[in-house]
Amino acid sequence: MSTSKSENYLSELRKIIWPIEQYENKKFLPLAFMMFCILLNYSTLRSIKDGFVVTDIGTESISFLKTYIVLPSAVIAMIIYVKLCDILKQENVFYVITSFFLGYFALFAFVLYPYPDLVHPDHKTIESLSLAYPNFKWFIKIVGKWSFASFYTIAELWGTMMLSLLFWQFANQITKIAEAKRFYSMFGLLANLALPVTSVVIGYFLHEKTQIVAEHLKFVPLFVIMITSSFLIILTYRWMNKNVLTDPRLYDPALVKEKKTKAKLSFIESLKMIFTSKYVGYIALLIIAYGVSVNLVEGVWKSKVKELYPTKEAYTIYMGQFQFYQGWVAIAFMLIGSNILRKVSWLTAAMITPLMMFITGAAFFSFIFFDSVIAMNLTGILASSPLTLAVMIGMIQNVLSKGVKYSLFDATKNMAYIPLDKDLRVKGQAAVEVIGGRLGKSGGAIIQSTFFILFPVFGFIEATPYFASIFFIIVILWIFAVKGLNKEYQVLVNKNEK
């Protein structure tokens, strides 16, 4: 009897630690490996792209890149993707897009990065044009370092195309409902484990004592890893098509749930939906407020990181360390987030994100505005300069804001859709994705880039008081939106329970 109990206990423990059945490993492990390779590249690109742009062009250029290059490029990429889907099989679409990224990484690693003087315009010409046309100086500087701008854009597109689109589309296509409940939670943990691995890889290859290549080619080993990783993604995808999709135990198209077509609304239709439904408008405001407030703090923080770590290598190593902490904090929030949601009200859970943003944002901006006071009173005690403390507080703010998003912010946002009737839920969610998604991601960048165009003599140092003011206004509006949405939410919940 005791042996049977012990076996049952071990069986249950195994299901908690590794909920994948033995025969399913043939499907899960290659899928997980594909995701790991995609995320290894994703997190490496995220660390490197800022290092090139911030140190060679300027922190201010990031908002211009996001608004005027990345956003249009994402639209063009989606149009090309749709066209490819019309003329090629889905399997071949995957190969074409992944091969494009692989080809670009090779081009950048062996041509654009090693020979910047050959591919970029004359530095003096760019500087003279910037002085002659100050309102457009950031556009001119971006053109002057166009290869780094292209790398930044490709890095942004990798996450959108490879992870959000191609990987999840493939995973959703071949995964049964019963499998998804076990597979997808494991994917979430794996996703965040890729971040600390990236941090270790970047820290090793960019360390001053590591001399694998010439000093001016320090990033080449990282590019080689990304090229290898991209090649492994293609091989794994090919293997799965040959060995998993032909195994009836693991893939039966008839058993895979038919995907429901999501409601698609135009930009104008989405605006009408948001302005005519107070409930949907509140949800859109939450998403916009989150995206804008994160971008406003992140821009100022990155300008301070550049002051502390002025070289590409030092800056990239620091961003790698940032991702290390972000990965573990995200895992911690994933584990505790569901418990918080079970034990507190919707209002309390939804308030955690804006209050955390307000408190950490206030601490970050305080260390910038009152750096002279801090230098006199706290530097000796804390054995750190005001700049170091500001960068540290900014990193904590960024780590927490991204960690809490996936566990609490997204969960409470999705819970808010549940009490709505089916028509409003489907159309409202589509409207929020169109308006909230676009304005949330690009809103902060639009504010910053417009400010720098109107006031060309300003950099982040001069503009920080204005960005801080906008940040606090946005977060306060966010808090009021949560309160307003909670009232509407409780009315619908009580109505549905009757």
From Swiss-Prot:
The keyword Acyltransferase does not apply. It is found in: Cell membrane. One of its GO terms (cellular component) is plasma membrane. The keyword Chloroplast does not apply. The chain crosses the membrane at residues 34-54, 68-88, 93-113, 148-168, 185-205, 219-239, 280-300, 321-341, 349-369, 380-400, 439-459, 466-486. Keywords: ATP-binding, Cell membrane, Disulfide bond, Membrane, Nucleotide-binding, Transmembrane, Transmembrane helix, Transport. It comes from the Bacteria. Disulfide bonds join 37-85. It holds the Pfam family TLC. Residues 1-33, 89-92, 169-184, 240-279, 342-348, 401-438, 487-498 are cytoplasmic. InterPro entries: ADP_ATP_car_bac_type, MFS_trans_sf. Coiled coil: none annotated. ATP binds at residues 436-442. Its main location: membrane. Residues 55-67, 114-147, 206-218, 301-320, 370-379, 460-465 are extracellular. SUPFAM superfamilies: MFS general substrate transporter. It is a multi-pass membrane protein. One of its GO terms (molecular function) is ATP:ADP antiporter activity. GO terms for biological process: ATP transport. Belongs to the ADP/ATP translocase tlc family. Provides the rickettsial cell with host ATP in exchange for rickettsial ADP. This is an obligate exchange system. This energy acquiring activity is an important component of rickettsial parasitism. This is ADP,ATP carrier protein 1.
